[in-house]
Amino acid sequence: EGNIFKLDKITYKSIKKIPEVNAYIEQGNRVLGILGYTEHSRGHAVKVAETAGDILEKLGYNEHTVELAQIAGYMHDMGNCVNRVDHAHSSALMAFQLLREWKFPDEDIAAIVSAIGQHDEQTGTAVDAVSAALILADKTDVRRNRVRNPIKENFDMHDRVNYAAVASSLQVNVEKKVILLEIELDEEICSILDYFEIFLQRMLMCKRAAEILGLKFKMKANGNKIC
C-alpha cells in the first residue's frame, strides 16, 4: 500500500521516484562502500538504464522494449543490499516481487527479471535484446568518479582501472553494425594490458551481448584499436 504511488501506469520515470526501490539501491551502495567496492549508487543505476535504453532506441527497437531495458537497468543492482555474492539473482527476485505488486504484465516481468538475473559475468550471459543492452551498459560504465577509496596506494585492481579511466564513451554505429567503447586511460596508473587482464571476462561478455543485437563489439584505448 504505502510503497507505491497512485499511478495508472508505472514507468521507468516513475520507478526512479519510488522510495522503496531507491532505499534498496542506496543500502546496496553503502554495503559495497564498506566492502571496498566502487560506486553502485542511483547515479550508476540511471547511467546504466539510460545507456541501455539508448542502445535499443538507436537500433530501432520499439518504445516498450526500450522501457523494459531502462527498468531492468535501474533495478539491476538492488540485490547488493542482500549480499554482493549472487547479487544479480537477489536483484532479479526483488524486482520480481515489486513488479508483481505493481501489476506488470507477466511477459514484461519475465523479460526484466531475466535481464537482471543474467547481468553478472560470473553467472550470466546475454539471452535477448533487453539483457544484451543491460550488460553492455553496465560493463562499460568505467569512470574515475566511481572510485571511493581516497588512498591511491590502497587501490585494488578495479579501483586502479576505474581511476585510470579519464574519459569513456559507448557509441552505436547502425550502418557499420558496430558498438564501440572508447576509453582514455592514464597509463601511469593502469596500462592497457592491465585493463584487459582485469576486465577480460567483462569484455567477452560484451562481445556476446553485441552479437545478440547483431553488432560487433569493438574497443579503442587511447586511440589504439584493441579489439
Per-region residue spans from a language model:
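Acidic/His-rich, divalent-metal-binding segments that scaffold phosphate/diphosphate chemistry
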Residues: 1-87, 98
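Non-transmembrane, amphipathic alpha-helical segments
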Residues: 37-40, 125, 198
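Inter-helical turn/loop segments and adjacent helix faces that build the functional surface
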Residues: 59, 102-106
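Short alpha-helical catalytic segment bearing the HExxH-like zincin motif
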Residues: 69, 73, 90, 116, ...
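Terminal helices and disordered tails flanking the catalytic cores of nucleotide-processing hydrolases
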Residues: 141-227
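Post-HEXXH active-site segment of zinc metalloproteases
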Residues: 86-96, 106
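Histidine/acidic-rich helix-loop-helix segments that form or flank divalent-metal centers
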Residues: 11, 105-168
